[in-house]
Amino acid sequence: MAEDVKPTRKNLMAIDDRIQLSERGHDTLEQKRDGLIMEFMDILDQAQDVRSDLNANYETAQQKLNMARAMEGDVAVRGAAAALKEHPEITTRSKNIMGVVVPQIESSRVKKSLDQRGYGLLGSSARIDEAADAYEELIETIILAAEVETAMKKMLKEIETTKRRVNALEFKLLPDLYENKEYIEQKLEEQEREEIFRLKKIKNKKEAEEEDEDEDESEMTDETVVQTPADD
């Protein structure tokens, strides 16, 4: 409340400083918010593409697996899967996007040669190889989708946080500061007018007293002149 602020020039200067600081902060946060939104839109486009690829790769992998099962049988497919010795390795790093730390997921040993798959040429068939290729491609797409969607969620959270801070400054803090400033300025003007009126009143009183003193002196002078005996 403005009434809680003492109307002093020191407080007025302090509020002016806070207003300038808050306005700079507001502008900076607006720029950050706009930049985050632009980055988010880029990531959103990428996420939509990755999601489309993910759905397509999943359908392809399922079709290849069904074909391998139909042509080679479940036993052969399960045997090829069980022969796998090396599993994919996942490592995560961090990257900074306009102050937002998002994960960067790196994978290795996802796509493999026949030897790396463990079953070799004799224990495989073209259908099983195609199914393995399709699922390795699907795994890489899943990893990319996880990275992109996690980044998107973090960016969206930061955008919402920044928007709340912008709104708090724009619709709460700055209006309160301007209200306090206006209140102090009005009170200081009132005090100044009261002081001017007080000084003017003192001045008028002093002038009136001086006039009274002059009149008294004049009357005394006239009386003295009247009482002085005339020369013979």
Swiss-Prot record:
Residues 209-222 have a biased composition (Acidic residues). It is found in: Cell membrane. GO terms for molecular function: ATP binding; proton-transporting ATP synthase activity, rotational mechanism; proton-transporting ATPase activity, rotational mechanism. Disulfide bonds: none annotated. The keyword Plastid does not apply. Keywords: ATP synthesis, Cell membrane, Hydrogen ion transport, Ion transport, Membrane, Transport. GO terms for cellular component: plasma membrane. The keyword Flavoprotein does not apply. One of its GO terms (biological process) is proton motive force-driven plasma membrane ATP synthesis. Residues 200-232 are annotated as: Disordered. Gene3D superfamilies: 1.10.287.3240. It is a peripheral membrane protein. Belongs to the V-ATPase D subunit family. HAMAP family: ATP_synth_D_arch. Has multiple subunits with at least A(3), B(3), C, D, E, F, H, I and proteolipid K(x). Component of the A-type ATP synthase that produces ATP from ADP in the presence of a proton gradient across the membrane. This is A-type ATP synthase subunit D. It comes from Haloquadratum walsbyi (strain DSM 16790 / HBSQ001).
